[in-house]
């Protein structure tokens, strides 16, 4: 997803350098905005996957062994890309261009008459693709911290024996 996003960056740089003038057409506007959000939310979910993988490695090391296989990782990446793309399909409907004097705007959101619907859509996407993954990441790191700060079994006995000597 990062590679596709990087390929779309020159058009966004041109758009903002030309003071918000979009000469590339509505279809390409939709495509570039889709790539932006696809990259954003795929990155969030991949960071969440990394957090869960670390949690499994620290808190459940034996179970984590079967999840560390390349085939599983490939399928998980494919699932992330497909889920995020599926959630963002409505963005292709909402994003559009509109004339603004002598320039054409490529809206990051939507046209004014669809804005209420867009707010509901983008709020749901934000909760599903940012809020929940962020919560999962926080829980994973909290559980890892608790596990790492817990004394090792038998560690307390050896230190008390040393004190008695």
Curated annotation (Swiss-Prot):
Gene Ontology BP terms? transepithelial chloride transport
Q: List the disulfide bonds.
A: none
PROSITE patterns named among the record's database cross-references: G_PROTEIN_RECEP_F1_1, G_PROTEIN_RECEP_F1_2
Which residue ranges are assigned to the Cytoplasmic compartment in the record's topology? 52-74, 146-165
Q: How does it sit in the membrane?
A: Multi-pass membrane protein
Q: Does the keyword Membrane apply?
A: yes
Q: What is its main location?
A: membrane
Domain of life of the organism encoding this protein:
Eukaryota
From the record, give the transmembrane residue ranges. 1-16, 31-51, 75-95, 125-145
Q: Name one GO cellular component term.
A: plasma membrane
Which residues does the entry place in the Extracellular compartment?
17-30, 96-124
Q: Name one GO molecular function term.
A: G protein-coupled UTP receptor activity
- What's in the keyword line of the UniProt record? Cell membrane, G-protein coupled receptor, Glycoprotein, Membrane, Receptor, Transducer, Transmembrane, Transmembrane helix
* Residues linked to a glycan: 100
Enumerate the subcellular locations listed in this protein's record, separating them with semicolons. Cell membrane
Could you tell me what this protein does?
Receptor for UTP and UDP coupled to G-proteins that activate a phosphatidylinositol-calcium second messenger system.
Question: Which family does this protein fall into?
Answer: Belongs to the G-protein coupled receptor 1 family.
Stored PANTHER family: P2Y PURINOCEPTOR 4 (PTHR24231:SF21), PURINOCEPTOR-RELATED G-PROTEIN COUPLED RECEPTOR (PTHR24231)
Protein's recorded name = P2Y purinoceptor 4
Which species expresses this protein natively?
Answer: Cricetulus griseus
Q: What is the lineage of its organism?
A: Eukaryota, Metazoa, Chordata, Craniata, Vertebrata
């Amino acid at each position: 997803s990062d590679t596709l996003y990087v390929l779309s960056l020159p058009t966004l740089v041109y758009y903002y350098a030309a003071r918000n003038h979009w000469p590339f057409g509505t279809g390409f506007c939709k495509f570039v905005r889709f790539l932006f959000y696809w990259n954003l939310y795929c990155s969030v979910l991949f960071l969440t996957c990394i957090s869960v993988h670390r949690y499994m490695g620290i808190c459940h090391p034996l179970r984590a062994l079967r999840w560390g296989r390349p085939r599983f990782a490939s399928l998980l990446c494919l699932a992330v890309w497909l889920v995020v793309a599926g959630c963002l399909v409505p963005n292709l409907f909402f994003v559009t261009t509109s004339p603004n004097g002598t320039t054409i705007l490529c809206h990051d959101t939507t046209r004014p008459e669809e804005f209420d619907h867009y707010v509901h859509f983008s709020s749901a996407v934000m909760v599903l693709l940012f809020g929940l993954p962020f919560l999962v990441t926080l829980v994973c790191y909290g559980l890892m911290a608790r596990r790492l700060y817990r004394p090792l079994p038998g560690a307390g006995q050896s230190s008390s024996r040393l004190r008695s000597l």
